[in-house]
Amino acid sequence: PELLENGMNFTSVIVKLNESVEASGIFLEDLQNDISHFLEHYHLKCLFAEKRVQYLVHHIYGRNALSPTTLSAVGSYISRQYDTCGKHLIAAGNTVTDIFRVYQSYASAVILLQNCFFFPEKTFLTENSIRLLSPKGPVPDFLQSPENTFSKYLLAGEEEPCFQFLDELFRYYSCNHT
């Protein structure tokens, strides 16, 4: 392995596979080779770690910090590589300088990964993409206690209001980062 120099920039990208998918070692090795080859065009490299089969962590690094455009291209490419695995979530952490701070990038990617559930599958979330979203505003009164409202409709056997309420709940929380 090559020596990592001081001042290297790192960005952690985490892919969470669907629970029912288990990627084989050979598949992952081929995938890592493809990603490494792609990253060479940007003068970047990758340290790969697999966590509990479902969480695939790519620590992307190089001398220069990734621009938002480069990060978007890298994230899109990595996401496409996992298309054969079916549904997956993907997020990138903040860029940090020096290897001893990589955990900070990883931790910020984990936090963003938690938000992926509110976005369409395969949406590549970054701090920048979240920042560009307009806030949804305060929770409407009728969504303040969703469990009470939903159980009221459910217990009354009111099918149409149940579906309308769930649609409203989905609309409010879909792509909502707040």
Give the ranges of each region predicted by the language model.
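Hydrophobic, helix-rich cores of sensory/ligand-binding and other regulatory modules
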Residues: 1-178
